[in-house]
Regions:
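PRPP-associated nucleotide enzymes
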Residues: 1-215
Length: 215
């Protein structure tokens, strides 16, 4: 979870923080945050992170991770219990009140954010959409370009994103696009919550991106 209490993001910016602190993985540990309704949640501690990171485990998420045959709608269905329980936790912790869901097409279709918000009685103010595609020059990838954009500005809301982080380039491009959009309109986000299937690469990307956005 990325906090955003001052400006867009909370706390002081420190150039290069993301790259430097990633050397300290040996100090990182999982601390149990809660165990409820069959969902176990652990918080990453000891890494001196800019953001908050949680690892969630539940029977259906373990099935998803360990069974390559799980595809299509079943992927979406497997993520509902853990996503819903995490949103309940965030609501209890006062970390989310009104949600604005950002759907990064097409990966976001695997994440049950709207349904989970409905189950946990979290108001979804609106859903925004972005589509980012690779730009090629002479048969080589030259960058990314936003091909479709339908953004709704909801000041002081929680921006929720569900996306699988591989290289992270799409997420980086879209997050910069959204934060620039809010800045251009003089608006602020309360925080950003990202649900993802990813590893340490995702944490490194988000730490570095947060520091860059603060500069």
């Amino acid at each position: 979870m990325i906090d955003a209490k001052e400006g867009l993001f909370y706390g002081k910016s420190e150039k290069g923080f993301g790259k430097r602190q990633m050397k300290n993985w040996e100090n990182v540990r999982l601390v149990r945050e809660f165990s409820d309704q069959g969902v176990d949640c652990y918080k990453l501690a000891g890494g001196d992170y800019v953001n908050e990171y949680y690892v969630v485990s539940e029977a259906e998420t373990r099935k998803l991770m360990n069974t390559p045959e799980v595809v299509g709608y079943e992927v979406y269905h497997c993520l509902i219990p853990a996503t819903s329980q995490m949103l309940f936790y965030f609501k209890e912790q006062k970390k989310v009140t009104t949600a604005n869901i950002l759907s990064i097409l097409r990966g976001a279709l695997n994440y049950p954010l709207e349904e989970s918000c409905y189950r946990e009685h979290i108001r979804v103010h609106d859903i925004s959409f972005l589509s980012s595609e690779r730009v090629f020059q002479e048969d080589e990838i030259a960058g990314l370009e936003i091909k479709y954009s339908k953004l709704t500005m909801v000041p002081d809301s929680t921006l929720m994103i569900g996306d699988i982080i591989a290289s992270g380039e799409t997420l980086i491009h879209c997050l910069r696009y959204v934060t620039d959009f809010y800045r251009a309109h003089g608006a602020k986000l309360r925080n950003i919550i990202i649900f993802t299937i990813g590893g340490t690469k995702g944490i490194e990307i988000l730490e570095k991106l947060t520091s860059e956005i603060r500069e």
